[in-house]
From Swiss-Prot:
Record: residues binding S-adenosyl-L-methionine: Y21, G64, S115, M191
UniProt keyword Lipoprotein, yes or no: no
Domain of life: Bacteria
Gene3D superfamilies: Aldolase class I
Enzyme class of the recorded protein, top EC level: lyase
Record field: catalytic activity: GTP + AH2 + S-adenosyl-L-methionine = (8S)-3',8-cyclo-7,8-dihydroguanosine 5'-triphosphate + 5'-deoxyadenosine + L-methionine + A + H(+)
GO molecular function terms attached to this record: 4 iron, 4 sulfur cluster binding; cyclic pyranopterin monophosphate synthase activity; GTP 3',8'-cyclase activity; GTP binding; metal ion binding; S-adenosyl-L-methionine binding
Family: Belongs to the radical SAM superfamily. MoaA family.
Record note on cofactor: Binds 2 [4Fe-4S] clusters. Binds 1 [4Fe-4S] cluster coordinated with 3 cysteines and an exchangeable S-adenosyl-L-methionine and 1 [4Fe-4S] cluster coordinated with 3 cysteines and the GTP-derived substrate.
Residues annotated as binding GTP: R8, R60, T91, K157, R259, M260, R261
Name under which the protein is recorded: GTP 3',8-cyclase
Quaternary data: Monomer and homodimer.
Native source organism of the sequence: Acaryochloris marina (strain MBIC 11017)
Lineage: Bacteria, Bacillati, Cyanobacteriota, Cyanophyceae, Acaryochloridales
Protein's gene: moaA
Pfam name, any one: Mob_synth_C
Length: 331
């Protein structure tokens, strides 16, 4: 297993979308009260005094939708100001991104991932949820993507969750975005966290099937740059951008895992695919437990992580019953 140096941080469990695979509008979700969410000060304390001393140097801000946090710019500035931080990125649905992109860039953010599950506004509307404004959302998301590209975010990555019978017919169109643009499209296998009923009904498509479609159309070569995350990177010959495939269902990448996840209410989770070994850091911090003690607890969990990842992995892929949605975990 790789050295664990990457923390995904959910800033908020709320979102302005209700995507089918994450927090469907058919579910009656109970969102956290504002007082239950880590404050910016608490979060920066944990990053500075607990995680960085343990070797964490790369951080990603997620949600829910992180741009719903009114203090998002302060959080970005605070993390960037820590000298040990090597990388800060964000994952967003881009609905609120266009007016914020320049400010985020000036605050120090350089890398951004944007969820874009369809290029067809009607299909996109079906995926993001039923409300009176849903048909207008694709245009705002696309404007946010264009603005981020214009401002200079690099790399700019587009995350695509493929759902059988919903958007699987768009694989080639989405892959084609990388040909003339220095964009990076990442296909993510649909998994049961968030909507187990839809998962059981629709199933999922292995990454290799998507690669075969793309390979048959254009050819496919190994990407020139391979990250240290879970994505297998490829490239259409001559394309400016790359294609990534995150295959948590079909191709175990536990040996490459380098991350933990911190929920908006301060629960530290060592593995996405199961709920073993979670630590409640927020309650401990508010109860006056020292950051030295919290650091020791996280260190012990880091030592257990390989066993949790390998031995408990199947509990998250077959018959799993998750108590938290993807929006609560932080993706």
């Amino acid at each position: 297993m790789n050295a664990v140096d990457y923390l995904r941080i959910s800033l908020i469990d709320r979102c302005n979308f209700r995507c089918q695979y994450c927090m469907p509008d058919t579910q009656d979700l109970q969102f956290l009260q504002p007082t239950a969410v880590l404050t910016a000060t608490e979060l920066l304390t944990l990053i500075r005094d607990v995680f960085i001393p343990l070797g964490f140097a790369r951080f990603r801000l997620t949600g829910g939708e992180p741009l719903l946090r009114p203090d998002i710019l302060d959080i970005v500035r605070g993390v960037i100001a820590l000298p040990q931080v090597k990388d800060l990125a964000m994952t967003t649905n881009a609905f609120l991104l266009e007016p914020l992109a320049q400010d985020l860039f000036e605050a120090g953010l350089r890398r951004i991932n944007i969820s874009l599950d369809s290029l067809v506004p009607e299909t996109f509307a079906t995926i993001v949820g039923r409300d009176s404004q849903r048909h207008k959302r694709w245009n705002k998301v696309w404007a946010g993507i264009q603005k981020a590209y214009q401002v200079g975010f690099n790399p700019l990555k587009l995350n695509v969750v493929i759902i059988p019978g919903v958007n699987d017919h768009e694989v080639l169109d989405l892959a084609a975005l990388t040909i003339d643009r220095q964009w990076h499209v990442r296909f993510i296998e649909f998994m049961p966290i968030g909507n187990a009923d839809l998962f059981c009904d629709r199933g999922w498509i292995p990454s290799e099937e998507l690669r075969t479609q793309i390979r048959d159309r254009w050819g496919l070569t190994d990407g020139q740059v391979q990250g240290n995350g879970p994505a297998d990177v490829f490239q259409i010959p001559g394309a400016q951008g790359t294609l990534g495939f995150i295959s948590q269902m079909s191709e175990c990448f536990c040996d490459r895992c380098n991350r933990m996840r911190l929920s908006a209410d301060g629960w530290l989770r060592p593995c996405l695919l199961n709920e073993t070994g979670q630590l409640d850091l927020k309650t401990a911090l508010r109860d006056g437990v020292s950051t030295d003690e919290l650091r020791d607890r996280v260190r012990q969990l880091l030592e257990l992580k390989p066993e949790i990842n390998y031995k408990e992995r199947q509990s998250g892929t077959v018959g799993a019953n998750y108590s938290r949605t993807m929006s609560q975990i932080g993706g």
